C-alpha cells in the first residue's frame, strides 16, 4: 500500500515517520465518534475539526495541541511537508469509507483532526477592550457564525453563558472556519 511515489518521498516519509496507513479499529472508530457528544468531549478534553482549512488554521494557530490526524491519501501527498513543520503528530491515512464513519458531515472533507480543548480563562479582564457576552445561543451554527464575525471585528474575548451551545461542538467549530 504505497501512498507516495518516488525514492525521495518514500525516504523522507520513512525518516520523519509522518504517516501510517492503517485500518481504524472498531474501538478507535467508536472513540472518535464519541467526541461528537459533549459528555465525551468534556471527559477526554478533546474536540474534532473537519476539513483542510479548519485543520490547517488550528495547526498554524498553535493554540490547540493536535492529538491525531486522519486524512485521505491525496491530502497526505499534498500536505506532507507543511503539516510536519506544524506538528509532530503523525497522520493516519484512511480510506473514504473510514472517514465517512467518523465524520459528522454527509460529504466528508479530506481530513479530520482531534485537538485538545483550550484552557478556559475564568478571570474576566474587560479593561480597555471589547468583550462579547452571549446568553442562550443554542444553535451551534449561529454560535460559530457569531464567533467568526467577532473575530473579523477584532473581538478576542467571548463569554458564553451556561445556556449556550458547546463551543467545541463540531458544528460550532465548522462554522468558525477562517477565524
Task: Say what each PLM segment does.
Residues 19-77, 164-165:
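Boundary-proximal intrinsically disordered activation/regulatory segments immediately upstream
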Residues 78-88:
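Short, aromatic/basic amphipathic alpha-helical patches
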Residues 91-114:
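Glycine/small-residue-rich loop that forms an oxyanion/phosphate-binding "nest" at active or ligand-binding sites
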Residues 106-126, 157, 164:
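Acidic/glycine-rich phosphate/pyrophosphate-binding loops and surrounding catalytic core
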Residues 124-179:
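RNA substrate-binding interface of SAM-dependent RNA methyltransferases
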